């Protein structure tokens, strides 16, 4: 059977890729090992968080689905870092895991141009030169032809789980791993490796003594992840906080020899910023305790997730150290924690549009690329789906820059630097994070989604109204001046005769203070928050914009794909090797490759500025 596009895998990357392709009118097939586990939240029951929440809103602004699914399935909402600056604040929501999964599958099933099929892909169909994708072959012998394939295998490609001495060829507990494609990829010359991740035990709610824990409530004001949603009024469940203690650490230390992490059996690197409890005990010996969050997994389940206690120790040891924690003395484990090791492709093998350098038409996204997390996977899946569609249309790739989005930072880091450990997004990875606030995701990206055809007229019109209203209120602030009769408190006295716009720049004055004086400035909370942040941080934002403009000049110097850098005289040996391997798309990407010197960038610029080298510069220095 023939399709325009095939997506391998039904996780968060696969969902976004399949929806993007089908919504852009391409006949798409998603093949996954189990249709009942589409969109499964394999580890923590939450979406969003620092930088991750920003990415979810960026996905939504571009026309992706993750924001709408979490808005539908959330059971608690919080803004993290609320006491800090807006650049590092981020929305996070606990999810009802089953509700999230069900909604994801339902969305796929109801999508036009999209078919779902349960099977395991074991090989590719390729052209005679073995450098162009033509389709896939499944375990049961089915052959499906297509001109593009998006590969999103998650933790299932040669996945292996570890619980003490127990080993099983699985990508998740009780779910078999996938074999076949690993051999195909190796035979095609892909640089591959092993990575490791893990998950904690789940326990029964009835066995927890919540009186010994700290309760953590959600925020009363819920900010929807999707810009298409208005106010959300949701019932919320509480989370709880407890801590490990000296006895917990002793139990783990005494049994460290039983951990496959420290016996040498696991060769893959684990996530640096989401370590197992064994790692924490070894690496942070000076800490007397570690914080543990007890999180509900949904409205209709009694299972609780122990955030911060990921472990692959034997089940009896897990039971022992969990019972040493206050509030969990009688905790009953329903599912043990475990580690999972899996194959990944070094993302340096990919162009910035997430297409393979070795096989035309093969796009790769998610944990297969060495990333970690639902949000990182969904972001890559969306971009891979969009670029696969553009490949089918013979159009230029759509590549987001580092200055435009966290998604741009994520993909640029992966394809430029590669990775030897699961890559997780943080606000600190973005050089211009004040310009990447979660509330401005639509301002930055929705026009791109609209032009692509993923954002409909209704959503785009709603955004244009919001944009217009924000500017109208800013103009009103500039026109309105403070008179002496308006002053009701001492804070405002020094601002008499100034316009409201400049008064609002005072850190001690809020927009609410000014609305009390002039109620005509009032509007929805979303619009007022954006106005206030734009005005208060205008100076910083403008300085960043000036810097971004200069940096974007380097982005405008496009470099050819599949270029032989050995012919350029004056490049260092290291630069020749790294440019040949990475094949940077722009001079800016070339400058970010580790180990590259400014002199190498100058040599490149001079070489490609020469008209005889057939590279057109899109700006004047």
Swiss-Prot record:
Keyword Chloroplast included in the entry's annotation: no
**From which domain of life does this come?**
Bacteria
* One GO term describing the cellular component: cytosol
Under the GO molecular function aspect, what terms does this record hold?
Answer: flavin adenine dinucleotide binding
Q: Which SUPFAM superfamilies match?
A: FAD/NAD(P)-binding domain
Q: What is its main location?
A: cytoplasm
Question: Where in the cell is the protein located?
Answer: Cytoplasm
Q: Where in this chain does the entry annotate a coiled-coil region? A: none
| Tagged with keyword S-adenosyl-L-methionine | no
Known InterPro entries for this protein?
FAD/NAD-bd_sf, GIDA_C_N, MnmG, MnmG-rel, MnmG-rel_CS, MnmG_C, MnmG_C_subdom, MnmG_C_subdom_sf
**Subunit and interaction comment:** Homodimer. Heterotetramer of two MnmE and two MnmG subunits.
Protein name in UniProt: tRNA uridine 5-carboxymethylaminomethyl modification enzyme MnmG
Organism, by scientific name, is Borrelia garinii subsp. bavariensis (strain ATCC BAA-2496 / DSM 23469 / PBi)
